[in-house]
Each structure stands twice: as C-alpha cells, then as structure tokens.
Design a protein with these regions (language model features):
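Phosphate-binding loop that captures ATP/GTP phosphates
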Residues: 57-59, 63-109, 114, 121, ...
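Short loop/turn elements that form and flank the Walker-type P-loop nucleotide-binding site
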Residues: 24-26, 54, 93-95, 133-136
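Short glycine/serine/threonine-rich phosphate/pyrophosphate-binding segments
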Residues: 38-46, 68-71, 143-151
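Generic secondary-structure signature for well-ordered alpha-helical cores
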Residues: 30, 53, 75, 125, ...
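Short gly/ser/thr-rich secondary-structure transition/capping motifs
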Residues: 9-15, 81-84, 121-124, 144
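Walker A/P-loop phosphate-binding motif and the immediately C-terminal alpha-helix
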Residues: 28-65
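Extreme N-terminal, non-catalytic leader segments
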Residues: 1-38, 79
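Phosphate-binding/switch loop-helix module in NTP-utilizing enzymes
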Residues: 106-152
Length: 152
C-alpha cells in the first residue's frame, strides 16, 4: 500500500474513533472567547466541577496546549493518567469528573509548547479520539485561544 493510502486509512480510523467517542457524550460545551486572559479556563473548570457535583458524569478537556491551567485550578497537577496501547484514560476526580489536559503530558510544566497548527489540531483530535471518556452527560472543552478567536 502506498504511503498516502496509509495516511488516508489512518485518518479515516481517527475520524471513526472521534465519532464513536463523541456519540457517547450527550452535551459538548466549548467555553470560548475572542480575547485571552478573560477567565475562559476558570469558567470551564467551575462549570465542569459544578455539573459533576450535581451528579452529571462530566469530562473536562483542557485543550489549551500553550498554557494548560485546569490541573492547577483543580489541585491535581501531580495526578497521573494511564496511557497504554488501548488509549489514554483521563484522571478521575470522584464522584463524577474526568479530566484530560496537555499538562499531564509535559515533563516540565513551566516549559512553553511551541507547535504549529497541524500538530496542535492533531493533539486535540487525539484527546477526543484516544481518550476513554466513556459515557458522559457533558464534555466541557477549554479550547486553544486560536480556536476561540476563529469563532468570534
């Protein structure tokens, strides 16, 4: 098989995983703003935490790869996630909150992440496709600032 066919098949498989995962999530909410530093992450964390405290199975995806701050806000910056051949398992905060953040994957939490557009989008796609969110009532997404500005 040619390399381009392999990439195409891989892309189709990724799309199928993303679709399959998203179908298990009743409501997807992206907290967005056209400007940085306005409290987007704070709103996302508080919304996810409140929904989980009310008994809703909730996921929080910190897709801001340049400055993942949700782990610090939740006090779980030292918590570990499990990643194996079956995918990535988000950190759980009992009783109903699951969290995935780029912050879990960085060895140096203060080091800047400098990625170009396609790599950034690939990371976000992987967070949705490879993370085992399970059945959720809500997935709260704190997106990249660039994605927020695209929608404003």
């Amino acid at each position: 098989m040619k390399k381009s066919n392999l990439n195409k098949n891989e892309s189709i498989n990724d799309d199928l995983k993303i679709t399959e995962n998203l179908q298990k999530i009743k409501h997807k909410i992206a907290v967005m703003s056209g400007k940085g530093g306005v409290g987007k992450s704070t709103v996302a964390v508080n919304l996810a935490f409140e929904l989980s405290m009310r008994g809703a199975d909730t996921g929080l995806l910190d897709a801001d790869i340049h400055g993942p701050s949700t782990l610090k806000m939740l006090g779980i910056e030292n918590k570990q996630i499990i990643a194996d051949n079956n995918g990535i398992f988000p950190a759980g905060i009992p009783p109903h909150l699951k969290v995935m953040s780029m912050g879990f994957l960085l060895s140096d939490k203060d080091a800047p992440v400098i990625w170009r557009g396609p790599v950034k989008m690939g990371a976000i796609r992987q967070f949705i496709g490879d993370v085992h969110w399970g059945n959720l009532d809500y997935l709260i997404i704190d997106p990249l600032q660039e994605l927020s500005m695209c929608r404003s």
